[in-house]
UniProtKB/Swiss-Prot annotation:
Molecular function via GO: fumarate transmembrane transporter activity; malate:proton symporter activity; succinate transmembrane transporter activity
Protein task: Responsible for the transport of dicarboxylates such as succinate, fumarate, and malate from the periplasm across the membrane.
Record key words, sorted: Cell inner membrane, Cell membrane, Membrane, Symport, Transmembrane, Transmembrane helix, Transport
Annotated family: Belongs to the dicarboxylate/amino acid:cation symporter (DAACS) (TC 2.A.23) family.
The organism's taxonomic lineage, starting at the top: Bacteria, Pseudomonadati, Pseudomonadota, Gammaproteobacteria, Lysobacterales
Chief place of localization: membrane
Protein name per UniProt: C4-dicarboxylate transport protein
Gene: dctA
Subcellular location: Cell inner membrane
Organism the protein comes from: Xylella fastidiosa (strain M12)
SUPFAM superfamilies: Proton glutamate symport protein
GO cellular component: plasma membrane
NCBIfam families referenced in this protein's UniProt entry, alphabetically: PRK01663.1
Amino acid sequence: MHPSSRANGPAPHKPYNPFYLQLYFWVIIAIILGALLGHCYPAVGQQLKPLGDAFIKLVKMIISPVIFLTIVTGIASVAHVGTVARVFGKAMVYFLFFSTLALLLGLVVAHVVHPGAGMNINPVDLHQGEIANYVEKSHDLTLVGFLMDIIPKTLLSPFVGDNILQVLFVAVLFGIALALAGERGKPVLNLLDALTVPVFKLVQMLMKMAPIGAFGAIAFTIGKYGVDSLVNLGWLVGSFYLTSLLFVLVILGAVSWLCGFSILKLIRYLKAELLLVLGTSSSESALPSLMEKMVQAGCRKSVVGLVVPTGYSFNLDGTNIYMTLAALFIAQATNTELTPAHQLALFLVAMLSSKGAAGVSGAGFITLAATLAVVPEVPIAGMALILGVDRFMSECRSLTNFIGNAVATLVVSRWENALNHEQLKIALDGNEAAYQSLHAKDAEPSLSR
């Protein structure tokens, strides 16, 4: 390195680092202001729901192009179909193992804490009208239906819907076809490579609107449900948050340590995205940014393109913890005795139903209804108990799902020898000078490496 460049190395550090110019700072401010507005003026807060909905719709608008371009260019550049199958297989092994751990953890905590004990609720007295819609949707959840729904009606229909797995399916097939086309497919690959630049610029533009979306979403949540709704069921909510924290810091933390990185540094690296997920209660709102940041952290683009979108359907750690914990809470609150056989049935069905509801609005509640349906002894009407606080637990579900998918991407990348450890260290250590030097090469073209 030239002496002058070393001497001037720290110079660009300050212009990029003022906290008041960072996205996460303004998202925090928006969340605080939204919560205050929703608490002090509930009616006004509820009217701001369109702000949050509009932002999430804008992000969903760009998700399909991001996934398609990332996967197609990644697979086509690999040029080996066997590599794609190997990465997918490793990802599914990881997802199955940690989804099982999450379900078991929720089950164990429910037995240790007994969050519903002593409530002595009579299911007949519960108002079931509000949960009827969720129960009806749960009837449509079948494994065969879920698998068939992955196949789109036409090649273009995934881009006008909201099923991530359909986009993933088409992108993988198109990427493999492009790789098999060889030199004749190069012009198409170059075109798609060039398209990644404006698409990811658009992602950056949309992310600047995140504070507005977070403000509206939080104002609506607090305005409609109120902080008071947390008091009566605080033991359940607290148990869920602590269990999710335990899963992230202990289980995912141990996996991260074994793979050579810190879970706390990863959380710091993704702080802007995590705050966005917290504000919007939707992990999908940060999906494009997560894919971009994982590549910038040293993961190979083809691995990111396969693991992240697939993980959004198959690696829902927060949802899995919620389902077993909530199911046993309802059983305890209604004084329902569950035998080991009943609990095993709940566990097995939860493993399947959590995948079948991917991309469905109100997925957590719908999968819970589907899971409870296999054990008639547990009254589905008991779901009305947690309807008021489900929105507050939704944030924790989304955050845990998001962190779980970030860790999964790094672990599978390392497993596949597709992780640049030096680049990862620079990103997670927050070495601004080195990071800006790396980022100056233009993050979007780096996606096509």
